[in-house]
Regions:
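Catalytic Walker B motif of ABC-type/P-loop ATPase nucleotide-binding domains
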Residues: 144-148
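Short, charged/small-residue-rich alpha-helical element at the C-terminal edge
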Residues: 215-289
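ABC transporter nucleotide-binding domain
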Residues: 161-248
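Hydrophobic anchor residue at the start of the ABC signature
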Residues: 133
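Conserved catalytic motifs of ABC-family nucleotide-binding domains
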Residues: 140
Length: 297
């Protein structure tokens, strides 16, 4: 798919497939194209090129069928200010009377510690977010599309939201959520896509992505470091303190460890990359053109 707003490219030919029954994280900073992608999937805006299907339905020609099966939480959540929370959920329930489940609704409200008796205009950002989450989860949709779902929530409620999403996936439903809170994505996602300046630069299972991504290694040699070590493909020196070298290995550690094994080593430490390390590696890639680097900021 591709989408531009005037001279600004929001999406540049992205190709993305999400398997059903999984929790899929969509990563990128503000302005990278996450929200534009979500809006196209829900037919809230139209792409300039390309097509998309959700649950087997064409996003444009069969958008009503898509929406019947999707629970959506927008990043710019807007609610009916004059309604109470319970009135708003009654309103949402009225669109899907066959899926009304008062017991499940009460459970969601209790778990998120939400007061439904107050007018929406009087709710804090966090409580509005809770209400938005309840309406998205309410009818147990086949697919949850959530744009920054834990925004404005305190850590205790964030943990409860994570449990709700894990339960949804455990029931065979799909969770597609965008976020820039990397520890949260790492904690619950099975797969992730990283979008940069409107392009998908990585799509992979979280464990595989981390395993073949950057490792930070610190080695203290008994003698000066071998000159060939830092010449290995994918090895980038960070700093050197006498016989101790700190460097990054971007193409796995096998070749690096073999080179180190030919020397007398006094100390060796390696740090398994977090998802944040992986993400930052993509966003600090020196091969990224300057215009794209600015666009993704």
């Amino acid at each position: 798919m591709a989408k531009a707003y005037g001279a600004t490219r929001a999406l540049s030919g992205i190709d993305l497939t999400v398997e059903s029954g999984r929790i899929f994280g969509f990563l990128g900073p503000n302005g990278a194209g996450k929200t534009t992608t979500i809006r196209i999937l829900l037919d809230l805006i139209r792409p300039d090129a390309g097509a998309a299907t959700v649950l087997g339905f064409d996003c444009q020609r069969q958008s009503l069928e898509v929406r019947r099966r999707v629970g959506y939480l927008p990043g710019d959540l807007r609610l009916y200010e004059s309604m109470r929370g319970d009135e708003f959920l009654d309103f949402i329930d009225s669109f899907r009377p066959e899926k009304r489940d008062p017991a499940y609704r009460r459970a969601l409200v209790d778990r998120l510690d939400l007061d439904l008796t107050r007018r929406i205009r009087a709710l804090s950002k966090g409580n509005r977010q809770k209400l938005g989450l309840v309406q998205a989860l309410l009818h147990r949709p086949n697919l949850l599309v959530l744009d920054e779902p834990t925004s404005g929530l305190d850590p205790i409620v964030q943990d409860e939201v994570v449990r709700l999403l894990e339960e949804a996936a455990g029931e065979g439903r799909t969770v597609f959520f965008s976020s820039h809170v990397l520890p949260e994505v790492e904690k619950i996602s099975q797969s992730v896509a990283i979008i940069r300046a409107g392009k998908i630069v990585a799509i992979e299972d979280v464990a595989k992505l981390k395993a073949r991504s950057v490792h930070v290694i610190e080695v203290t040699f008994a003698a000066p470091p071998p000159p060939g070590l830092l010449a290995l493909p994918g090895v980038r020196e960070l700093r050197r303190d006498g016989a101790t070298v700190h460097f990054q290995a971007h193409d796995g550690v096998d070749a690096v460890l073999k080179a180190i094994a030919t020397q007398r080593v006094l100390d060796l430490r390696t740090q398994q990359p977090s998802l944040e390390d992986v993400f930052l590696a993509y966003y600090t890639d020196p091969e990224l053109p300057q215009e794209e680097r600015r666009a993704s900021a």
